């Protein structure tokens, strides 16, 4: 959900809440009639929407970081910057590239560790576990990946999800992608459901007996 849309929703909620609060100081009979009708709890819904959107934005940051690893793997392994062609071939010198991928993986873990939401706890924990497993795999393979002359083959096994063999991290990276995808979908659904509560039908209570 776009930030402008969320801001508009929250502003509308604020106006509704303000109007509801001001009505309580007015006519008693009018208040009694109003209280017999139950609409959505706007204060509660406002918090749900704000919290849901914060989680979704954080997950999108993680998705962007993952995409950067994907982009590096697809386009930068075995390459160097060329003044005319953009990227030119330079095989088997991928040490700095792998160090960058590792740095991004630790940032992903940091972002996921900061996520807190009871409704998404299971999916957040699953993504955290996959993130930690991927980062640890890169560290475990430091003999092959922690040097300047990392071969193209080893680099692909570490961070290219579509590579034939994935023994140095690519398999774990694929699972991390999947877990974050599941988390993102759940976060979007949670936000959509919170917004839907705004349109919940008003329920009239049975009049109280004198």
Curated annotation (Swiss-Prot):
Record-level GO cellular component terms: cell surface; external side of cell outer membrane; membrane
Induction, as annotated: Expressed variably in vitro in strain B31; detected in immunocompetent infected mice at 10 days post-infection but not after 17 days. Not expressed in the tick midgut of unfed ticks, expressed in tick midgut following feeding on mice (at protein level). The change in expression is at least partially due to a temperature shift, expressed in vitro at 37 but not 24 degrees Celsius (at protein level). More highly expressed at pH 7.0 than pH 8.0 in vitro (at protein level). Transcripts are most abundant 7 days post-infection in infected mice, but continue to be expressed for at least 21 days.
Outcome of mutating residue 51 to E: In strain: 2591
InterPro entries xrefs: Lipoprotein_OspC (IPR001800), OspC-like_sf (IPR036437)
Effect of residue 103 to V: In strain: 2591
Compartments where found: Cell outer membrane; Cell surface
Lipid attachment, kind S-diacylglycerol cysteine: 19
Membrane-topology descriptor: Lipid-anchor
Effect recorded for residue 136 to D: In strain: 2591
Keywords: Cell outer membrane, Lipoprotein, Membrane, Palmitate, Plasmid, Signal, Virulence
Pfam family, one: Lipoprotein_6
Residues spanning the signal sequence: 1-18
Mutant lacking the gene: phenotype: No observable effect on growth in vitro, infects ticks normally, required to infect mice. No change in ability to colonize the tick midgut, no change in bacterial migration to the tick salivary gland. Loss of infectivity in mice, including SCID and NOSCIDg mice (deficient in T and B cells, functional natural killer (NK) cells which also lack complement C5). About 40-70% more uptake by murine peritoneal macrophages and human macrophages (B.burgdorferi strains B31 and 297 deleted); no change in uptake by neutrophils. Whole bacteria no longer interact with human plasminogen.
UniProt xrefs under SUPFAM superfamilies: Outer surface protein C (OspC) (SSF63515)
Lipid modification (N-palmitoyl cysteine), residues: 19
Subunit structure: Homodimer. Binds human plasminogen on the bacterial surface, also binds human plasmin. Interacts with tick I.ricinus salivary protein Iric-1. Interacts with human complement C4 beta chain (C4B); whole bacteria bind to wells coated with C4b. Binding is inhibited by human complement factor C2.
Other comments on record: The causative agent of Lyme disease, the bacteria has an enzootic lifestyle. Larval ticks are infected with bacteria during feeding on infected hosts (mostly mammals) which retain the bacteria during subsequent developmental stages. It is transmitted to the next host when it is bitten by ticks. During tick feeding (which can last for several days), bacterial migrate from the tick midgut to the salivary gland where they are transmitted to the host.
Function: A major immunodominant protein in mammalian hosts. Required for the initial stages of mammalian infection. Interaction with tick I.ricinus salivary protein Salp15 protects the bacteria from antibody-mediated killing in vitro and in vivo. Inhibits macrophage-mediated phagocytosis of the bacteria. Binds human plasminogen; this probably confers an extracellular protease activity on the bacteria that allows it to traverse tissue. Binds human complement C4-B, which may inhibit the complement cascade. Experiments in mice suggest it may play another role after initial infection.
Family: Belongs to the OspC lipoprotein family.
Name of this chain's protein: Outer surface protein C
């Amino acid at each position: 959900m776009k930030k402008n849309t969320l801001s508009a929703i929250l502003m509308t909620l604020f106006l509704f809440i303000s109007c509801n609060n001001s009505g309580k100081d007015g006519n008693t009979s009018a208040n009694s009639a109003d209280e017999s009708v139950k609409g959505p709890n706007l204060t509660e819904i406002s918090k749900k929407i704000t919290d849901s959107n914060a989680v979704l934005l954080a997950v999108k940051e993680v998705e962007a970081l993952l995409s950067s690893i994907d982009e590096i793997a697809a386009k930068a392994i075995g390459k160097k910057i060329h003044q005319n062609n953009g990227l030119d071939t330079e095989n088997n010198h991928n040490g700095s590239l792998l160090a960058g991928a590792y740095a991004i993986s630790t940032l992903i873990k940091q972002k996921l560790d900061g996520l807190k939401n009871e409704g998404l706890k299971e999916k957040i924990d699953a993504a955290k576990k996959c993130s930690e497993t991927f980062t640890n795999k890169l560290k475990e393979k430091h003999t092959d990946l922690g040097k300047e002359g990392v071969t193209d083959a080893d680099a692909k096994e570490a961070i290219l999800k579509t590579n034939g063999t994935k023994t140095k991290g690519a398999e774990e990276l694929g699972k991390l992608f999947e877990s974050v995808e599941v988390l993102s979908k759940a976060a979007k659904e949670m936000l959509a459901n919170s917004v839907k509560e705004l349109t919940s039908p008003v329920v009239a209570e049975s009049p109280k007996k004198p």
